[in-house]
Amino acid sequence: MIPKVSLPASRRMITLEVRRREFLTPGFACVTLGGPALRDLIVTGNDQAVRLFFPREGQSALRMPTVANEAWIAQLLVLPKAVRPWVRTLTIRRARPADGEIDIEFAVHGDAPLSNWVRRVRPGDPAGIFDMGTMYRLPEHARGQVLVGDETALPAILSILDGIPPSLPSEVFLEVAAAADIRSFEAPAGSRIHWFSRDDGDPRPGAVVLEAVRRAALPPGPLYAWTAGESRLATGVRRHLVDDRGVPKRDISFFGYWRLGRSTPG
């Protein structure tokens, strides 16, 4: 059975500052965070996730939790909103330990707290992270893989592709909100990249890419699958692979990053 999350041996709350922000496409931005405290981060690559703490609009300082375990949630919730930061889960896109920097990529959309922060952030602004480990686990018996996600899963999938053997047959299905957010990148030799945008088809998040997976010719097995994004996309891909393709449940990692119509509490 593939473990859902692999945590590092030790974790700490890490306070950093914004070094740079760059818009990659109209709907995607990259924020570089840095600082000497990054020496406490154990970089594992793949889909390594962190809790990102960032100030609410109007807060001049960042008040981080002080406990380096899951009790941080209770510690955060007792803070009044006047000093409580926002927190969201993101993937480390790149890590440069020698420079004391990490890059985090964001899908920027609508009037959401995270998107608004990305739009207004400037160098020197505070931010913090807490390591949440990795969930990608390629079994030794896998002879190919399938990666599926919407725009919220794109940074994780790109990071996974950075670390796989170039010869591993990989079918990669990526959905973004608009064609303007499709971008070129250097993929491993064994990977085939399939882009889809919702402005060319069904506007429901995940519907276009899920239908594409159902119609696709996949690599011969045994297969490993990793899928994430809107909750119904992740569960739909898993159900299809298990029921229609015969992929064992233990060889599928799936994660509902968000649910349509439901906001993340803060």
List PLM regions with ranges.
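Extended, composition-driven regions rather than compact fold-specific motifs
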Residues: 1-266
